Amino acid sequence: MKKESKYIIQEFSSSIEQSLLEQIYFLNQENTPEVGDLSSIKELQNLLRQSSNNYYVIFKNRIIGFMICFREKSDYNSKNYKFFKKKESKFLYVDRVAINEKYRRFGIGKNLYLKIESIAANNDLPICCEVNTDPLNEISIRFHKDLGFTEVGKCKFDNHSVVYLRK
């Protein structure tokens, strides 16, 4: 993709067209362990029903990226989400961001974050997320620090570890 190529960032919900939902699911699976594994498209739909702000990135009629976010009142059962729910009275939690490997380094991730930064600013919300430290996702850690995120905690799970970030 050339820098001047046009991609579109589109908001979506759990009622998204099935073919687009499938593309998001497969992109998610291609990006594990950087994002959490989903057992099925149905699990993705359940995730979307609980979420608040979701965007996909489309280029030449294919989804090349997406972002799924939650607000503080969700019933989302993620331990990482619950970390922030205990610490913040209100917040916007970035659960997952995935960009097709071919389309990385074109500013897509940054533009997705710009979308939610305006929502966060208009609602006086911190943006919260976690990034893997084991296995190490150094690119994502650097990306978030460059965007102004700071570390607010860490957690070691049985099969991986994360750093918690806030902006």
Q: What residue spans do the PLM features occupy?
A:
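Short amphipathic alpha-helix that is part of the acyltransferase structural core
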Residues: 2-42, 59-64
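Conserved GNAT acetyl-CoA-binding A-motif
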Residues: 120-133
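Conserved acetyl-CoA-binding loop-helix of GNAT-fold acetyltransferases
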Residues: 99, 105-118
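A short, internal acetyl-CoA/4′-phosphopantetheine-binding micro-motif in the GNAT/acyltransferase core
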Residues: 95-104, 133-134
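C-terminal "cap" of GNAT-fold acetyltransferases
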Residues: 4-7, 154-167
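Conserved beta-hairpin
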Residues: 53-71
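Conserved active-site alpha-helix within GNAT-family acetyltransferase domains
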Residues: 133-153
